[in-house]
UniProtKB/Swiss-Prot annotation:
It comes from the Eukaryota. Coiled coil: none annotated. This is P antigen family member 3. Residues 1-61, 78-113 are annotated as: Disordered. It comes from Homo sapiens. It holds the Pfam family GAGE. Residues 1-12 have a biased composition (Basic residues). Belongs to the GAGE family. InterPro entries: GAGE, GAGE_fam.
């Protein structure tokens, strides 16, 4: 039997390499609104889907949209109390250890508590 091997052409390899560098889908980065932007945001324009004769609670939808935006903004803020960068309203609790501990010198053995 002969040891015939099938090889790919160089132009095909280059084409495959070029294709792999292109993103498959579009990537969109979106900045979250700042607290000032959320407060300054005006209510959305009324929907064009409103039909005459239909009762509508105008304030409920606006409140839900703005409330959701504020809720999502708050979720992005970590307030665990144990991390740097938390706001002044976050208080972390650290329990003090009031028992004296003797740290042994090199070669002394186990520390006494």
């Amino acid at each position: 039997m002969s040891g015939h091997q099938r090889t790919r052409s160089r132009s095909r390899e280059r084409r495959d390499d070029q294709d792999s560098n292109h993103p498959v889908g579009a990537v969109v980065a979106q900045e979250l609104p700042s607290n000032d932007q959320l407060q300054q945001e005006e209510p959305p324009i009324e929907s064009q889907d409103y039909t005459p004769g239909q009762e509508r609670d105008e304030g409920a939808l606006d409140f839900q949209v703005l409330g959701l935006a504020a809720y999502l903004w708050e979720l992005t803020r970590s307030k665990t109390g144990g991390e740097r960068g938390d706001g002044p309203n976050v208080k972390g609790e650290f329990l003090p250890n009031l028992e004296p501990v003797k740290i042994p010198e090199a070669g002394e053995g186990q520390p006494s508590v």
